[in-house]
């Protein structure tokens, strides 16, 4: 597995060397954009339409923040790099511990497996056992890929998992959704609620993750495989016309050579 982050996790005076690995393998099917005529991948050039149609070199591109319409402040790469280093330490500290059910699932973002570095296996296992016994989550700050995250550390099967969580200001207010109904405007009858609850009970089953697959992705994969197979058949057949054309060309060349030779013989005979 590819290491996403490497450093130390501090629990009081105890330091645990850890590595983070992505827990999710997003095997999305990606398409390329090709030119219809020559099947060459489309390329996009960077240019400034108000200045030039020529492609702008990377050395002439700067980062900027738009603080008002068409008003920008330029961000120096050295300033950004220094700021990033100051807030991206290679050690993280558990801020506090919280109850396992205190965080709403909407706050969870990305998941990472936590593995110990050599020599820190026992400390790693100690933290895992303590979290399991207390049914708690460890709350931390961590910087991953140039962004600082709030995150939790919890037990997961045979190891530990780190899950980044959104900051409160990143979650939109559901009251901004238009036409949200309320009991005052749409009173629910007791028998309606009873029927809905009975239906939920009837359709309730244990969650078996292996029963659920990405049906669209499976169908798309099958379509792609069929197209590859069809193209392979076409490519295996396509050389035949070339061979026939070559044979015809060679035969025609032979006939022309015969004619030229016959004409030459006739001239010499005269």
Swiss-Prot record:
PANTHER family: NON-HOMOLOGOUS END JOINING PROTEIN KU
Protein name as annotated: Non-homologous end joining protein Ku
Lineage: Bacteria, Bacillati, Bacillota, Bacilli, Bacillales
Keywords: DNA damage, DNA recombination, DNA repair, DNA-binding
Entries under CDD domains matching the protein: KU_like
One Pfam family hit: Ku
Subunit structure: Homodimer. Interacts with LigD.
HAMAP family: Prokaryotic_Ku
Function, in words: With LigD forms a non-homologous end joining (NHEJ) DNA repair enzyme, which repairs dsDNA breaks with reduced fidelity. Binds linear dsDNA with 5'- and 3'- overhangs but not closed circular dsDNA nor ssDNA. Recruits and stimulates the ligase activity of LigD.
One example GO MF annotation: double-stranded DNA binding
All copies of domain Ku, residue ranges: 10-194
GO biological process: DNA recombination; double-strand break repair via nonhomologous end joining
Family designation: Belongs to the prokaryotic Ku family.
């Amino acid at each position: 597995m590819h290491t996403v982050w490497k450093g130390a996790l501090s629990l009081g005076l105890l330091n645990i060397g850890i590595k983070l690995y992505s827990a999710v393998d997003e095997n999305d099917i990606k398409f390329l954009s090709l030119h219809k005529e020559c099947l060459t991948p489309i390329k996009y050039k960077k240019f400034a339409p108000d200045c030039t149609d020529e492609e702008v070199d990377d050395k002439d591109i700067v980062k900027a923040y738009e603080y008002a319409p068409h008003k920008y402040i330029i961000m120096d790469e050295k300033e950004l790099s220094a700021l990033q280093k100051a807030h991206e330490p290679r050690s993280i500290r558990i801020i506090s511990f919280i109850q396992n059910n205190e965080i709403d699932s909407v706050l969870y973002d990305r998941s990472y497996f936590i593995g110990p570095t050599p020599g820190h296996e026992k400390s790693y296992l100690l933290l895992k056992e303590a979290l399991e016994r207390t049914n708690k989550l460890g709350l931390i700050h961590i910087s991953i890929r140039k962004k600082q995250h709030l995150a939790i550390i919890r037990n997961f099967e045979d190891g530990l998992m780190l899950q980044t969580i959104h900051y409160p200001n990143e979650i939109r207010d559901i009251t901004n959704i238009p036409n949200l109904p309320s009991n005052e405007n749409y009173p629910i009858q007791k028998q309606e609620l009873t029927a809905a609850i009975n239906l939920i009970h009837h359709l309730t089953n244990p969650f078996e993750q292996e029963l659920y697959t990405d049906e669209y992705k499976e169908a798309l994969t099958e379509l792609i495989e069929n197209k590859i197979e069809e193209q392979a058949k076409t490519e295996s057949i396509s050389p035949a016309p070339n061979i026939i054309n070559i044979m015809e060309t060679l035969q025609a060349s032979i006939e022309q050579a015969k004619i030229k030779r016959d004409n030459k013989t006739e001239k010499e005979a005269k």
